[in-house]
Amino acid sequence: DLHRVDRRQRQMCIRDRFMTWGESHGEGLGVVVDGCPAGISLCEEDIQKFLNRRKPGQSKYTTPRKEDDRVSILSGVFEGKTTGTPISMVVYNKTQRSADYSEIAGYYRPGHADYTFDEKYGFRDYRGGGRSSGRETIGRVAAGAIAVKILEELGINVCAYSSRIGGINIDYNNFDLKECDNNAFNMPDSNAAMQVEKYADGKLKEQDSMGGIIECVVTGMMAGVGDPVFEKLDANLAKAIMSIGAVKGFEIGDGFAAADSTGSTNNDSFTIKDGRIVKKTNHSGG
């Protein structure tokens, strides 16, 4: 019964720590995951299926750089199971073209970390953004794949999708997660995806880009994970998401819309359902 899960299982959800490393045009990028419990079934294919979803060059709307992004597990796994020791994984860069970036060595790109890297370190790797490249997320995805394995054992499921791109919102009446695999924008609404495709084609011609919103939903999560103040679960989630390059906002539940609400309508009341304490609403996002 996940609702009577013991303290060790609760802590197992949050004790993993990871550190990413590598640069966009270096030999490779990777991650070290520390704190993973022993005995979890894990192989490279468990990681690869998630990396295949994020690898570049899969549509005309992403970077034209093409990489296989094949992962190798270097440590922490023996005979198909985690050993409880740090898990190290690496993806080697294969098609980096550093000469393409020689022109920007002497100036700063807007919306990038070029200027701040120079200010902080007095030196920067200008090739593809170096450490600040979007390829840094390779390590996050690999670590997340391990987290998925752990969470699945506890009956916890995580899904994410694009809910808004270029000012175009999905219609929740047309919501179908299977549609995410049928369009280049990971949108669960085929009509919205078609509108975004038309909009994106226009931005391609203008040599411009566009922003969007990603929603993430977690089901099966037990109560009581996290700490009361500085290690609040929502605080740690916000820090994790805001550390991703280009992310400029984070909401849980109704988020900023709660500012226009009242306590009587925003606060989630409790009730009893099937012998369990549950909330009548979910404005707080769990």
Could you describe each region identified by the protein language model?
Residues 57-76, 169-173, 179-191, 197-204, ...:
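A structural-propensity feature for long, helix-poor, extended segments
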Residues 20-21, 27, 207-286:
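Glycine-rich anion/phosphate-binding loop at the beta-strand->alpha-helix junction
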Residues 119-229:
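Glycine-rich, mobile lid/loop segments that gate access to catalytic sites or pores
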